[in-house]
Amino acid sequence: MKTLTSQGIRTYGRLLQATKQYWPIFLIGVVGMIAVSLSDAGFTWLIKPIINRGFIARDLVFIRWLPFIIVLVFLFRGAANFLSTYFINRVARNIVMDFRRAIFSHLLRLPAEFYDRHSSGHLLSTVIYNVEQVAQASSDALIITLQASSLVVGLLVVMFLVSWKLTLFFLVITPLIAWVMRVCSARLRHLSTSVQKSVGEVTHIASEAIEAYKIVRLYGGQKYENEKFRHATKLNQQRELKVVVTNSVGTSLVQLLIAIPIAIVLFFATQPSFHVTAGSFASIVSAMIMMLRPVRRLTMVNSYIQKGIAAAESIFKLLDEDVEKDRGERHLVRARGAIEYQGVSFAYDNSKKTILSEISFSIEPGQMVAIVGRSGAGKSTLINLLPRFYDASTGVIKIDDINIKEFRLQELRNQFGLVSQHTTLFNDTILNNIAYGQAGSIDKRKIIEAARAAHAMEFIEQLPEGLDTVIGENGVRLSGGQRQRIAIARALFKNAPIHILDEATSSLDTHSERHIQAALDNLMDQCTTLVIAHRLSTIERADWIMVLEEGRLIEKGTHQQLLTLNGAYAELYRMQFAEKPAAMTALDE
């Protein structure tokens, strides 16, 4: 338990350290909270003279001033309460904003293998849910802790001033209260961590089903997804209820422990041998009863703090993840486009299986090279090593005769354009999607040229808002072919010296494909192009073709040379084109 507690203290200390820039604002809120507590405690002290001097002694001067005193006390309390609530919550919302920005910025710099290990649902849960838990720990918990504890201290001072003997009875149960809170604290921390994991699972299942809604419906997966979601939400509900039970039991025990000394005080105060004025008795009993609420709130704040610490631990764990290694110092404005692989092998971390083995080849600037092979042969992995989404396990990759690890990472990636069969677009305008990531002012004329070259202007001009049309999440408002043409226009606009085409025309109709292929041919004349090919008819004019099988480069040559070789490529070619005549025959019949 001590280890858990010390870890929690370190986490909370790191949380406070991360928010130290807001301490001046925070101190204003603290002063306001203390002022609120002092005014509440002061009002219980006023009960003694109100009864003794107002109702018993009938002090007319005191009675005359009493209404003004009460109004002033509550005016003071109202102003102090505004200061405390506003400034503490301002700090909390700033913390939420800062953490979300820090997490998002960090996520954009994490390596590809991190995303291989984590689902998007769990990451979204950290950004949204866990950060809010930290906000509660830094606002609600701090407000309650400081305000309630200062009120308890103020009430104890009032009780000592009124009757120190009666107050001692009350203090006897303090160690028991501390023990109950400590036991509840350990359990709440454990439960809070499990609740956050269950929320991440709920988010993951929901986001996955929403993104794949077409597949879910086409394959009748509604029942299966519903069962998964029901199970995840049930688990989350059970864990949340365990938190509620633990919190409620702890609060009830603390209230019971406080009620016992109140009963004892009432018993002794009413004994004839115990001399106490009516005002003193009313004041001390009022203080004791008033203390029930802040003590109850202090036991509840334990739940907030434990949730906040558990959430902060997950946030700091994410922020402590190593970002992509970028030790390169060479500048690379625009590459010529020469590419060389020298004995490159690759295996994922903690995996014994080799994905690529001893791959060697070189590409001259301006060449078009196709990569073919069966599914799982390593085609995509081979390409992913080039912009350093992954680093080769052994061997060297060069661009323009220089090891790619020597270049600054972003400058290296600026040399590539990508058009994939799995098109990625953003919930933004067509114009911003085409010009995505390009710094500086956007030249609309060049965007139109790129869109026209990609044959995208044909449908863009028919849209009411043209290039300013917002296309929805991943371009949901466009057809598959239209989305693909936007992606091609984006690559044309970037005009990078090296282009990666992953079956770039797969979503286009035959008419559009001819025009796009012509545009891509013009682009290939000016840059080096790597084509991951599934349809072999699209790569017959490649300068040369490499064939991968189980991570090894087994054949290399032009289309005609590989057909003459009558090896793996020729077999793939015959398989594809044997289907085409059969399909045409069926159509003729």
UniProtKB/Swiss-Prot annotation:
It is a multi-pass membrane protein. This is ATP-dependent lipid A-core flippase. SMART domains: AAA (SM00382). ATP binds at G373, R374, S375, G376, A377, G378, K379, S380. Residues 27-307 form the ABC transmembrane type-1 domain. PANTHER family: ATP-BINDING CASSETTE SUB-FAMILY B MEMBER 10, MITOCHONDRIAL, ATP-DEPENDENT PERMEASE MDL1, MITOCHONDRIAL. It catalyses: ATP + H2O + lipid A-core oligosaccharideSide 1 = ADP + phosphate + lipid A-core oligosaccharideSide 2. One of its GO terms (molecular function) is ATP hydrolysis activity. The gene is msbA. GO terms for cellular component: plasma membrane. It is found in: Cell inner membrane. GO terms for biological process: transmembrane transport. Its EC number is 7.5.2.6. Residues 339-575 form the ABC transporter domain. It is an enzyme of class 7 (translocase). Belongs to the ABC transporter superfamily. Lipid exporter (TC 3.A.1.106) family. The chain crosses the membrane at residues 23-43, 60-80, 153-173, 249-269, 272-292. Keywords: ATP-binding, Cell inner membrane, Cell membrane, Lipid transport, Membrane, Nucleotide-binding, Translocase, Transmembrane, Transmembrane helix, Transport. Involved in lipopolysaccharide (LPS) biosynthesis. Translocates lipid A-core from the inner to the outer leaflet of the inner membrane. Transmembrane domains (TMD) form a pore in the inner membrane and the ATP-binding domain (NBD) is responsible for energy generation. Homodimer. It holds the Pfam family ABC_membrane. In MsbA the ATP-binding domain (NBD) and the transmembrane domain (TMD) are fused.
